[in-house]
Design a protein with these regions (language model features):
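Short aromatic-glycine-enriched beta-strand elements
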Residues: 44-54
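Short, structured beta-strand/loop micro-motifs enriched in basic residues and often containing a Trp
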Residues: 67-76
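Conserved hydrophobic positions within beta-strands
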Residues: 36-38
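Cleaved targeting-peptide boundary
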Residues: 19-27
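N-terminal signal peptide c-region/cleavage motif recognized by signal peptidases
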Residues: 14-16
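OB-fold/S1-family single-stranded nucleic acid-binding modules
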Residues: 97-122
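Short nucleic-acid-contacting surface segments enriched for D/E, G, S/T with interspersed K/R
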Residues: 76-92
């Protein structure tokens, strides 16, 4: 009986964990680039969020929210809590939500006006931070 309960819970919770980490809500075949003003960097787990206000093609303000990596994942890519200043101009590259009515995306990277780029999940090999070779 105990082994059946353990099996049930393992199967049940593995589905929940998989759903949480699913990227099904995002169009992974499409990239969008949003230029705007950084209004929030939500530095928290399980995912950090970058919030940018941009102007749409009709001249209306649009607030975009981009889901990033965990804090540890961002730090491995060179991010810190103070990598950006609220109010600075940035360009965000992301995978859009499959629902075009949603101003929400999966973050690829953020580029500052200086040209410095911060990657969320992965980065080109030539720009990877050096690792201690001990």
């Amino acid at each position: 009986m105990n082994s059946k309960c353990v099996l049930f819970f393992c199967l049940f919770f593995s589905g929940i964990a998989n759903a949480h980490h699913s990227r099904a809500a995002f169009d992974l075949e499409t990239n969008i680039e949003i230029e705007g003003t950084l209004v929030e960097l939500a530095w928290r787990n399980p995912h950090a969020y970058v919030v940018v206000e941009s102007i749409d093609e009709k001249g209306n303000p649009v607030v975009w929210t981009f889901e990033g990596h965990s804090i540890a994942g961002l730090m491995r890519n060179g991010w810190t809590r103070s990598s950006f200043e609220i109010g600075e101009r940035v360009v965000v590259d992301a995978r859009p939500n499959r629902d075009p009515e949603q101003s929400f995306g999966l973050l690829n990277y953020v580029t500052r006006a200086s040209g410095e780029t911060f990657y969320a999940f992965s980065q080109p090999q030539e720009s990877a931070p050096p690792h201690d070779a001990r």
